[in-house]
Curated annotation (Swiss-Prot):
Swiss-Prot/TrEMBL domain comment: The Clp repeat (R) domain probably functions as a substrate-discriminating domain, recruiting aggregated proteins to the ClpB hexamer and/or stabilizing bound proteins. The NBD2 domain is responsible for oligomerization, whereas the NBD1 domain stabilizes the hexamer probably in an ATP-dependent manner. The movement of the coiled-coil domain is essential for ClpB ability to rescue proteins from an aggregated state, probably by pulling apart large aggregated proteins, which are bound between the coiled-coils motifs of adjacent ClpB subunits in the functional hexamer.
Pfam family for this entry, one: ClpB_D2-small
Protein name: Chaperone protein ClpB
Cellular compartment(s): Cytoplasm
Keyword Repeat: yes
Upper classification of the organism: Bacteria, Pseudomonadati, Pseudomonadota, Gammaproteobacteria, Legionellales
Species: Coxiella burnetii (strain RSA 493 / Nine Mile phase I)
Length: 859
């Protein structure tokens, strides 16, 4: 018999049976070897066929294994095996059955009827497992659906829908899909398009994370519950698995063959199947090779003829990039736009999903946590969309609590380490014989007993808490399962089971859950374990994602912002008008009175050099974000040429450096919450101001690659020396008079539309002598801090402080000369004395004024 008459799948089975016989040292390939291999084929037709024919597969596998074990083992054959007489007879019968059915190739399923007709060991095993020849032949006809085997790869194309699609309606029936809340308008629109006579293929278009796939899952649930028009009832919604379709398609045309088989099976279903293609743009160009047709082109005829009922989903960008380019494909789909839900809708969606996440993580999710997830994600995570980002927050916060519950509490861990430490000490003291050691040993024994008792008590509490939490999780899982069963019973019309569940099992589980929750409440005061996701946990996750200190977000807004001036004045001496202006802008923003679509605040700081313009920015960054790193500093003197604008926002397409992005836009994309300092703004080219106009007005900027960067959470500060000579001139005059004079100079330099967009222009005063003295105290405190790290202490007398302040005072240059004076008069001589060894670590250094210089003494 010619081996090439068999299908590819059966040829593979024969080869595997041969290697099985060789591995077991058998002389012949027996039918049992082939049977074992056919049953183990992952995508074979024999196992499903036997299952449909009510054959007991586990009994059959046992029988086949026993038969293989009974064959004699022959050594010294050199791996040479032959087809046994029994197998040869079965193969001949398979050929006969194939010819009777007018098949061109012999397929695997004929092996079973042939084995049952040929009298042999395998026939007895099959009959014992419950095989019936007539039932199997009938199921073969059902499997083939009147088709003949005309290709060697025919078996691979069978049951294409089962292999290459995922049944969403089946998932909905078994309760494996998450509930879909809201989105009624989009689902109704999708159903409306599906009901059309032609072009009945909706494509859901929306930003990533707005819930396009969820809408299709919602449709599957509605089909299952019968909440759809008559035309859609009893239909199956299948999701095309592109990965399975492409995976393993090694040869040219194999991918097209598989897709053709899927389309053929769908056509046979005669409209009873709706195909869902997620990431629809992947179909355009999939399987494309030189001279070959891609998947998108293969779909067109089926879509045009109405054989294929299809729902697609893709993002706006990908739709434009791939589908709109192919006008013939685009016209076959009807667009359904999916907008991002509002915060209120997102809260409703989260409330609907809450139970699923509680069961999965085994924690309780509070309602304030849900509200916090929606509001905080909308406010702070601007580059993603609701409800996806809010769901992620809840999911991560719940997994964090679960992780804490599963690991040992910090308090227990600390006691355990302490116990180990004490026991090591006890072992060391046992070797000592002096009285002090013996006394310490007896004290140690008492301490060990106390710590052991404390540890065991705490461990007991921890175990009981853990057990109570585990109890509620188990009850919640049972309750969810009971509800899924109730829905299934309702669909099946099983009234007895429905009443048993609704009036017996579910109320009983509710009662158990209530009791377990009350027991859990008893532990709530002295918790070792957190079992609830509150707004605090959600805020913690937000801070991990966005680097905003969580305490700052949860601290009462009033308390935090009312003492803002005091905090800023710890670093910035004088300049009350500037500090108040900044504080008021931040307060307006946080109280929700300022425009949410503009930056938190935009300021123009004007004043002479060294008066604290840049220092105020640093103080603001520390106050708002706890770190100076949150300040993006750009020296505008570097942007004096017209073309340097590209450095801020990125080079346009076609230019070198296009992929790299801009300095300003990239910094804010990575850290959207920062203080932006544009130093020496008057030195920049005029075109740079044009770029800043939309940042100051709309809080947004489009970079070289067309991405919108969000500046709404930034504080923008620009500094300038314009009019500094006037500030010195008007130093004794009224502040408003001085400001008006300076603003006249500013108006001559900057365009009106630029000045008009700034929240406030603040004029800094020249520093007075007493302010320089206060700055000297701050600077010396920093030196003390650095010395403390090296284990030195420093004190300075008032005389010495006055002397340094006097030397450092310069009305023209501000506080910078003071820094130089401290360097020359204090840091230089002190570092020399430390290196000479006059002061050793641990010493207290006292600085006093002696004549016209400072004296350093060890106190």
């Amino acid at each position: 018999m010619r081996i090439d008459k068999f299908t590819t799948a059966f040829q593979t089975a024969l080869a595997d049976a041969q290697s099985l016989a060789v591995g077991r040292d058998h002389q012949f390939i027996e039918p049992a070897h082939v049977m074992k291999v056919l049953l183990e084929q992952t995508q074979g037709t024999v196992a499903p066929l036997l299952e449909q024919s009510k054959v007991n597969l586990s009994r059959l596998i046992d029988g086949v294994n026993k038969a293989i074990d009974s064959y004699p083992q022959v050594e010294g054959t050199g791996g040479e095996v032959h087809v046994s007489r029994e197998l040869s007879k079965i193969l001949t019968l398979m050929d006969k059955f194939a010819q009777q059915n007018k098949d061109q190739y012999i397929s695997s399923e004929w092996f079973i009827p042939a084995a049952l007709e040929a009298k042999g060991q395998l026939r007895d095993v099959l009959i014992e497992a419950g095989a019936d020849k007539k039932a199997i032949e009938k199921n073969i006809m059902n499997l083939r659906k009147g088709e003949r085997v005309t290709e060697q790869s025919a078996e691979d194309q069978r049951q294409a829908l089962a292999k290459y699609t995922i049944d969403l309606t089946e998932k909905a029936e078994t309760g494996k899909l998450d509930p879909v809340i809201g989105r009624d308008e989009e689902i109704r629109r999708t159903v409306q398009v599906l009901q059309r006579r032609t072009k009945n293929n909706p494509v859901l278009i929306g930003e990533p994370g707005v819930g396009k796939t969820a809408i299709v899952e919602g449709l599957a649930q509605r089909i299952v519950n019968g909440e759809v028009p008559e035309g859609l009832k009893q239909k199956r919604l299948l999701a095309l698995d592109m990965g399975a379709l492409i995976a393993g398609a090694k040869f040219r045309g194999e991918f097209e063959e598989r897709l053709k088989a899927v389309l053929k099976d769908i056509a046979k279903e005669e409209g009873r199947v709706i195909l869902f293609i997620d990431e629809l743009h992947t179909m355009v160009g999939a399987g494309k090779a030189e001279g070959a047709m891609d998947a998108g082109n293969m779909l067109k005829p089926a879509l045009a003829r109405g054989e294929l009922h299809c729902v697609g989903a893709t993002t706006l960008d990908e739709y434009r990039k791939y589908i709109e380019k192919d006008a013939a494909l685009e016209r076959r789909f009807q667009k359904v736009l999916v907008e991002e839900p509002s915060t209120e809708d997102a809260i409703a969606i989260l409330r609907g999903l809450k139970e699923r996440y509680e069961v999965h993580h085994g924690v309780e999710i509070t309602d304030p946590a849900i509200i916090a997830a929606a509001t905080l994600s909308q406010r702070y995570i601007t580059d993603r969309n609701l409800p996806d980002k809010a769901i992620d927050l809840i999911d991560e916060a719940a997994s964090q609590i679960r992780m804490e519950m599963d690991s040992k509490p910090v308090e227990l861990d600390r006691l355990e380490r302490r116990l180990i430490q004490l026991k090591i000490e006890r072992e060391a003291l046992k070797k000592e014989t002096d009285e002090a050691s013996k006394k310490r040993l007896s004290d140690l024994e008492t301490e060990i007993k106390n710590v052991e008792k404390e540890y065991s008590d705490l461990e007991e509490v921890w175990k009981s808490e853990k057990a109570s939490l585990h109890g509620t999780q188990q009850i919640k899982e049972e309750l969810e399962q009971a509800r899924i069963e109730l829905e299934a019973a309702g669909r099946a019309g099983d009234l007895a089971r429905m009443s048993e569940l609704q009036y017996g099992i579910i109320p009983e589980l509710d009662k158990k859950l209530k009791a377990a929750s009350q027991k859990e409440e008893q532990f709530h005061d002295h918790k070792l374990l957190r079992s609830r996701v509150t707004e605090e946990e959600v805020a913690e996750v937000v801070s991990k994602w966005t680097h905003i200190p969580v305490s700052k977000m949860l601290e009462g807004e009033r308390e935090k912002l009312l003492h803002m001036e005091t905090e800023l004045h710890k670093r910035v001496i004088g300049q009350d008008e500037a500090v108040n202006a900044v504080a008021n802008a931040i307060r307006r923003s946080r109280a929700g009175l300022s425009d949410p679509n503009r930056p938190v605040g935009s300021f123009l700081f004007l004043g002479p050099t060294g008066v604290g313009k840049t220092e105020l920015c640093k103080a603001l960054a520390v106050f708002l974000f706890d770190t100076e790193d949150a300040m993006v500093r750009i020296d505008m003197s570097e942007f004096m040429e017209k073309h340097s604008v590209a450095r801020l926002i990125g080079a346009p397409p076609g230019y070198v450096g296009y992929e790299e992005g801009g300095y300003l836009t990239e910094a804010i994309r990575r850290r959207p919450y920062s203080v932006i300092l544009l130093d020496e703004i008057e030195k920049a080219h005029n075109d740079v101001f044009n770029v800043l106009l939309q940042v100051l007005d709309d809080g947004r900027l489009t970079d070289g690659q067309g991405r919108t960067v969000d500046f709404r959470n930034t504080v923008i500060v620009m500094t300038s020396n314009l009019g500094s000579d006037l500030i010195r001139e008007f130093s004794g005059e009224n502040y408003d008079k001085m400001k008006d004079a300076v603003m006249e100079v500013v108006a001559q330099h900057f365009r009106p539309e630029f000045i008009n967009r700034i929240d406030e222009a603040v004029v800094f005063h020249s520093l007075k002598k007493e302010q320089i003295r206060n700055i000297a105290i701050i600077q010396i405190d920093r030196i003390k801090k650095r010395l403390k790290e090296k284990d030195y202490q420093l004190t300075i007398s008032d005389d010495a402080l006055d002397y340094l302040s006097e030397l450092g005072y310069d009305p023209v240059y501000g506080a910078r000369p003071l820094k130089r004076v401290l360097q020359q008069q204090l840091e230089n001589p002190l570092s020399q004395k430390i290196l000479e060894g006059k002061f050793v670590p641990g010493s207290l250094i006292n600085i006093e004024k002696k004549g016209e210089q400072l004296e350093f003494k060890e106190a």
